[in-house]
Amino acid sequence: MNLFSKIKPIILSERLILRLPLIADYESWVVLRKKSEDFLNKWEPEKDVNYYSKNLFKKRVKWAKKNFDLKIVLHFFIFLRSNYQLVGGITLDNIRYGPFQSATLGYWLGEEFSKKGIMTEGLNSMMIYASNNVGISRIEAATLPNNIASRRLLEKCNFKYEGVGQYYLQIRGKWQHHILYAITFDSRKSNSKKILGF
């Protein structure tokens, strides 16, 4: 529990812990990502050749902490409360204030933990945290048209279809159209969660 007891912010839900990544998470992250490469690569942009290097991971950890302190990115790892096992990650990026109060959503989950409702629980917890602690009122997301699991997740969490982003993002070296979703918090319906942080 030493990696969790003194860290803030920590978001707790029924089964999950969400927190900033630490350098100590490196080995667990490499194992999970490599085990899930085939599962994840078809949905994600191509990776840097040094993607799995510890040095680059350290830079991402510092980036996450710096941008959290600036309140412009929330980049959290997701762990099981039962055994503190790393299962995935969730990010709110491009956080904008003023008249926008919005952010862009990204997430990933290890293959062995899919279809268990984990990301649904994690996303609902993140949305409550973002609304209550950061002042975000709108979250936008984009997914490939054939990523049925991702579309079902967003729709289950009450994201609404907004259209198609033409040649929105490069996946596997090719510009791909994406389905665009968004949620505003006055339309969100979710169970209350115990949330600590900020």
Predicted feature residues:
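A short helix-loop-beta-strand connector motif used in the catalytic cores of GNAT acetyltransferases and
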Residues: V49-N50, K62-F77
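Conserved GNAT-fold acetyl-CoA-binding loop/helix
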Residues: N41-K62
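Acyl-donor (CoA/ACP) binding surface of acyl/acetyltransferases
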Residues: M1-S28, L32-F39, H75-F198
